[in-house]
Swiss-Prot record:
Organismal lineage: Bacteria, Pseudomonadati, Pseudomonadota, Alphaproteobacteria, Hyphomonadales
Lyase among keywords: yes
Organism in which the protein naturally occurs: Hyphomonas neptunium (strain ATCC 15444)
Active site residues of this protein: 24, 99
Coiled-coil intervals, chain numbering: none
Sequence positions that bind substrate: 73, 79, 86, 100-101, 110
Site (Transition state stabilizer): 19
Keywords: Amino-acid biosynthesis, Aromatic amino acid biosynthesis, Lyase
Gene behind this protein: aroQ
Protein name: 3-dehydroquinate dehydratase
Length: 147
């Protein structure tokens, strides 16, 4: 059985669809995860969201052990979590960072990024579609490219 792609989300992503839809869009996290599962074919998707930094770090460690790739929207932890950065540095699998909005075009405090330096790439500002692009990259980089 092939290893899954992990799709992990940080704080407040459980509010997608209702929280600042003019910035984050109207898709819920469940909508996004359902689309990824449909696009992944026979590759399993492990999709989780948490508002807890420690839990997110534990899931990154699990993905490092059990996953083929990691798609991560760390949300606000992108800008604050050295613990998350340190966990991500241990990955031997591709890490694709995703943001629904473009943090570089927003408030100055969002310009600090502890995830990007350890990611293969970052997709930002494309809304929910960014997750689909991230899945395509994750599959290609982990050897499961779709034609």
């Amino acid at each position: 059985m092939s290893k899954p792609v992990y799709v992990l989300g940080g704080p407040n992503l459980n509010l997608l669809g209702t929280r600042e839809p003019e910035i984050y869009g109207r898709d819920t996290l469940e909508d996004i995860h359902a689309r990824l599962r449909a696009l992944a074919g026979d590759v399993a998707i492990v999709a989780r969201q948490t508002n807890s930094e420690g839990e997110l770090v534990s899931w990154v460690q699990e993905a490092a052990r059990d996953g083929r790739a990691l798609i991560l929207n760390a949300a606000a932890y992108t800008h604050t979590s050295i613990a998350l950065h340190d966990a991500l540095k241990t990955l031997k699998i591709p890490l694709i960072e995703v943001h629904l909005s473009n943090p570089a075009a927003r408030e100055a405090f969002r310009h600090v990024n502890y995830v990007a330096p350890v990611a293969v790439g970052t997709i930002a500002g494309l809304g929910a579609y960014g997750y689909e692009l991230a899945l395509s990259a994750a599959l290609r980089l982990s050897g499961e490219a779709r034609s």
